Amino acid sequence: MKPVNAKIVEIVEESPTIRTFRFDISFDDALPGQFVMVWVRGVDEVPMGSSYLNGITVQNVGDATSKLFDMKVGDSVGLRGPFGKGFTLPKKDEHILIIAGGVGAAPLGPLADYAAECGAKVTTILGSRECYELVFEDRFSSAGELHITTDDGSAGTCGFVTTVLADMDVSVYDRICVCGPEIMMANVMKALQEKDALDRSEFSMHRYFKCAIGVCGACCMDPDGLRVCKDGPVLNGSLLIDSELGDHKRNSSSQRVRV
């Protein structure tokens, strides 16, 4: 699949390090949790979870995202996708728990929107290091019940998403959907295992993608060889309990490095 030229039509500053970029094209068939490959010309092509049908929400963490942050309305990138498996779509009257950390809120925003529109009940735990790094607070609040956590206590509960999760009866949720920093997700996975809820959980994984179609193996997870771009990026929690999640990942040279 060749990249399609996409012109930036709007830039929203979500936090000092996170921005949403909207484009003049829309992936109307994209499902919550799927991703697109963003070609930042002259730098790199990187995977980004769709936060809107015509938008991505990005944290400035590397060369490609730094170049993207230098762009203005009217500049363009190349987009191809959508790729991968997204979250299981909720049904009317189901109750889903969303657990989002930092920019991990990006692929969960569309899920919250869809759930609210179809008549499902939504509860969200939204975490960040500080209050100004909270992403899509109003969006999740509009979808249903919202619990906020910050590492420094500047908003909501002082602590981590697992601080709130520890006191929850997760048996009331039909599905638990998670995305955030890997260490956060590993801790959530352990908490859900203790609550016997892993089989009802789905995690949106982050790995280094090259081909995005499951051929090159750059995004494979040990020990089962799960291809995150093809088998995921959304994977059932029961598949991850004995995986490298929270311990190792592969770098751009496909070498195993510690998270």
UniProtKB/Swiss-Prot annotation:
InterPro entries: Cyt_c3_hydrogenase_gsu (IPR012165), Dihydroorotate_DH_Fe-S-bd (IPR019480), Dihydroorotate_DHASE_ETsu (IPR023455), FAD-bd_FR_type (IPR017927), FNR_nucleotide-bd (IPR039261), PyrK_electron_transfer (IPR050353), Riboflavin_synthase-like_b-brl (IPR017938). Binds 1 [2Fe-2S] cluster per subunit. Binds 1 FAD per subunit. It holds the Pfam family DHODB_Fe-S_bind. The keyword Transport applies. Residues 1-89 form the FAD-binding FR-type domain. Its cofactor is [2Fe-2S] cluster; FAD. Pathway: Pyrimidine metabolism; UMP biosynthesis via de novo pathway; orotate from (S)-dihydroorotate (NAD(+) route): step 1/1. One of its GO terms (biological process) is 'de novo' UMP biosynthetic process. Heterotetramer of 2 PyrK and 2 PyrD type B subunits. Responsible for channeling the electrons from the oxidation of dihydroorotate from the FMN redox center in the PyrD type B subunit to the ultimate electron acceptor NAD(+). This is Probable dihydroorotate dehydrogenase B (NAD(+)), electron transfer subunit. It comes from Methanococcoides burtonii (strain DSM 6242 / NBRC 107633 / OCM 468 / ACE-M).
